């Protein structure tokens, strides 16, 4: 699980503080025995119950999907280890094999609810045969629709400059705001690629199988040149079970403006088209 036995009291007290509970009448140590599969299935309902409590008791001032996403991320942050702990564990698993390291990190990203399993499962996916071969088609339904109240609030909200974008390293542990998602349950793995600092993370929206992103520590516009291919090869040397590709070095890609050099990666259950 996310919480070791040594951290149970500490974690309980963090949750009590978050929910403004001064007394704990049920007594510490009362546990529900359940399998991992049952725990995964139970998580969204449990978070909903906790958020309902927060709304009813004035802890969560506004209700709605955006506000609930901000708050349930705060709940999960109480259960997530510090970045250094996750990085250390990742490297321990890498000593076994690259696959063991990414298996650990992907499952961790799901268990922390950074990747929301119960939303990702709504995505539509199918394979269509074409004269060029089988084509994987996906319709991503993981991103929640904002309610009108949240849209209006986001329009009026001050446009902050921190973090600089949705992908940069400063998002790790960020509390979020009405116009920027919370990332308190998010962890990033630092890498050295082409003698420069890069960072490895999974995408919360899973556009591809085990969809992850490697990005530069600096906000450098995306450029495709000789060094791009060197970076791609270096990464596949580190993680030979993944396939990857860079974004196009165009001013606007996928309807958004990219101010960060990044690479998309996927675990290829089939040959995949990577943007």
Language model features: what each stretch is:
Residues 1-224, 275:
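Active-site microenvironments that recognize anionic phosphate/pyrophosphate groups
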Residues 264-274:
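Residue-level detector of conserved catalytic or cofactor/ligand-binding positions
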Residues 207-208, 258-260:
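Short, solvent-exposed loop/turn segments at the edges of secondary structure
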Residues 242-255:
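A short glycine-rich, hydrophobically flanked beta-strand micro-motif that places a catalytic Asp/Glu
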Residues 216, 260-264:
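Histidine-centered divalent metal-coordination motifs
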Residues 182-185, 229, 247-248:
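Short acidic (Asp/Glu) patches
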Residues 212, 243, 258:
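Hydrophobic "anchor" residues on beta-strands that sit immediately upstream
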Residues 224-241:
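Long, well-ordered alpha-helical scaffolding segments within enzyme catalytic domains
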């Amino acid at each position: 699980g996310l919480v070791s036995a040594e951290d149970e009291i500490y974690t309980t007290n963090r949750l009590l503080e978050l929910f403004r509970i001064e007394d704990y009448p049920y007594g510490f140590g009362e546990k529900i025995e359940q399998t991992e599969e049952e725990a995964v299935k139970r998580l969204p309902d449990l978070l909903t119950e906790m958020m309902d409590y927060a709304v009813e008791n004035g802890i969560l001032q506004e209700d709605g999907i955006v506000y609930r996403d901000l708050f349930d991320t705060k709940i999960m942050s109480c259960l997530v280890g510090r970045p250094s702990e996750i990085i250390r564990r990742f490297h321990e698993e890498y000593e076994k094999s690259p696959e063991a390291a990414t298996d650990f990190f992907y499952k961790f990203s799901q268990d922390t609810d950074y990747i929301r399993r119960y939303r990702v499962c709504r995505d539509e996916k199918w394979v269509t045969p074409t004269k060029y071969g089988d084509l994987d088609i996906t319709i991503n339904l993981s991103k929640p629709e904002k309610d009108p109240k949240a849209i209006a609030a986001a329009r009026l909200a001050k446009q902050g400059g921190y973090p600089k974008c949705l992908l940069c390293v400063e998002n790790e542990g960020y509390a979020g705001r009405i116009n920027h998602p919370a990332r308190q349950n998010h962890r990033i793995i630092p890498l050295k690629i082409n003698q420069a600092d890069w960072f490895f993370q999974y995408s919360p929206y899973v556009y591809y199988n085990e969809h992850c992103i490697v990005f530069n520590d600096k906000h450098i516009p995306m450029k495709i040149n000789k060094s791009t291919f060197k970076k791609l090869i270096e990464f596949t040397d580190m993680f030979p079970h993944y396939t990857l590709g860079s974004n196009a070095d165009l001013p606007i890609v996928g309807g958004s403006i990219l101010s960060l050099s990044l690479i998309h990666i996927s675990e290829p259950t089939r040959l995949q088209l990577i943007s």
